[in-house]
Amino acid sequence: MSGITAALVKELRERTGAGMMECKKALVEANGDIELAIDNMRKSGQAKAAKKAGRVAAEGIILAEVAADGKFGALVELNCETDFVAKDAGFIAFGKEVMATVLADKISDIETLKAKFEEQRTALVAKIGENINIRRVSVLEGEQLGTYLHGARIGVLVAAEGANEELIKHVAMHIAASKPEYVNPSDVPADVVDREHQIQLDIAMQSGKPREIAEKMVSGRMNKFTGEISLTGQNFVMDPSKTVGDLLKENNATVTSFIRYEVGEGIEKVETDFAAEVAAMSK
């Protein structure tokens, strides 16, 4: 298993739901390329789908707010090491001060923001006893902006046109729950579509269908694929009988962009017990 680490096997298991030995074998055959291993597992039927890379491990809070003029909004992620500190009054107050500065000075660059608060961050680390990090900031500008916070762990910022406050809130809640990656199916990048098309074509061809029929089957699957990962193509969580696109059309509204943050996404946490499990299985 040279070059195939326990962490890599674990990530493949989490993203595909497949067993350990299947994941180990797939990674060996793909020379450690996890994306290639996922594609091969999907083609062979070992994995029906794959979760997006990025395991949630870090603690902290998400802040979401729109400036008083309603035309500038921001999301900020502030990380700490434990859930206990994430609820600490001093930690939360620091986050609110960071957000207030982002809105007042319209800061969109994370390094600029970090530099502005480095002295206060260092002092807070010394006081609380945990590492604290202003991890990221994203902003949107527009005529109609809205936010939604699910607890303090998921935050959404939406820019829309022709929508009222309630509609924007409902759409933001949907985004928090359903995790769309794009606004419209047509926004899905060509390379993402091409990759999925090839996977679906290989699956269809393996069933013994002629290429012409396989292509027709794949066409329908691709419409479903782009719809499922785009906001307007998803079934609305509050009324699954319609899509979010239908909802917006009924209200003569459009969503121009959105940002979704979840605490710790993409930050890896070492788990030594899993390494022991792999070692035991390889004996």
Swiss-Prot record:
Cytoplasm recorded as keyword: yes
Superkingdom assignment: Bacteria
Compartments reported by the entry: Cytoplasm
GO cellular component: cytoplasm
SUPFAM superfamilies found in the cross-reference section: Elongation factor Ts (EF-Ts), dimerisation domain, UBA-like
Transmembrane segments: none
Principal subcellular localization: cytoplasm
Keywords of the record: Cytoplasm, Elongation factor, Protein biosynthesis
Record-linked InterPro entries: EF-Ts_dimer_sf, Transl_elong_EFTs/EF1B, Transl_elong_EFTs/EF1B_dimer, Transl_elong_Ts_CS, UBA-like_sf
Cross-referenced NCBIfam families: tsf
HAMAP family according to UniProt: EF_Ts
PANTHER family attached to this UniProt entry: ELONGATION FACTOR TS, ELONGATION FACTOR TS, MITOCHONDRIAL
Similarity remark: Belongs to the EF-Ts family.
Name under which the protein is recorded: Elongation factor Ts
